[in-house]
Amino acid sequence: MKTLLILTILAMAITIATANMQADPSGQVQWPQQQPFLQPHQPFSQQPQQIFPQPQQTFPHQPQQQFPQPQQPQQQFLQPRQPFPQQPQQPYPQQPQQPFPQTQQPQQPFPQSKQPQQPFPQPQQPQQSFPQQQPSLIQQSLQQQLNPCKNFLLQQCKPVSLVSSLWSIILPPSDCQVMRQQCCQQLAQIPQQLQCAAIHSVVHSIIMQQEQQEQLQGVQILVPLSQQQQVGQGILVQGQGIIQPQQPAQLEVIRSLVLQTLPTMCNVYVPPYCSTIRAPFASIVASIGGQ
């Protein structure tokens, strides 16, 4: 049966081919030439159509798989974020907060260190002895240094005109000039802040010399108020007679004359308050030293 079918198909094909040849004898040469040209069109259309979709499959598959893969390291970046908030947050609040309240303990010795402040007022005690010792030492040194001034004032030397009872010896002008130069030289060597006290020391020396002379002569003398008893208008000195009220005025005259004579004679500046001081010598030195 198969062979019959094959033979019939071949016979039909032969008959069709012969019929076409007979219908167009000029196209016998062209038809067989046109059929092979149709055959290469098929492979060209088939081959590029199969090649072009193939790279389209590779490009989306390969990069699409690789690009989502680097998303994995993004998970790693998220992981280190966890240790950073965990590590610094725990040590910083725990460690510094504990030592700082502990360092508050050394604040206790500071109030304890106030104790050595006590010895500072203690050395003030020897300062109290200075006003007791210094005036006497200064007075003695000034009196010795200005002894020429006292001798000059006690002599009858012009232009000095002290009370006549204090004059001891009348000297010639040449001797008075020498004593005057010695007095001014010694007074110029004394610091300016002590010149007022030096002049008062001369006054004090003159008064003390007068008291010694009056004691030897058995006449009226000056004594401290603690040993005096007032009787009427005079002052009774036990066993030594009565001092008349006019004698303190006489001593005030001596004071004013000395304070006016020495600065003018030796050309020494003395503050105005120096002539108004009526306090004892120790108070004068203390007041001048504080200025």
Curated annotation (Swiss-Prot):
Function summary: Gliadin is the major seed storage protein in wheat.
Alphabetic keyword roster: Repeat, Seed storage protein, Signal, Storage protein
Biased segments, Low complexity type: 38-81, 100-117, 125-137
SMART domains per record: AAI (SM00499)
SUPFAM superfamilies: Bifunctional inhibitor/lipid-transfer protein/seed storage 2S albumin
Protein name according to UniProt: Gamma-gliadin B
The species this protein was found in: Triticum aestivum (Wheat)
Residue segments, region Disordered: 38-137
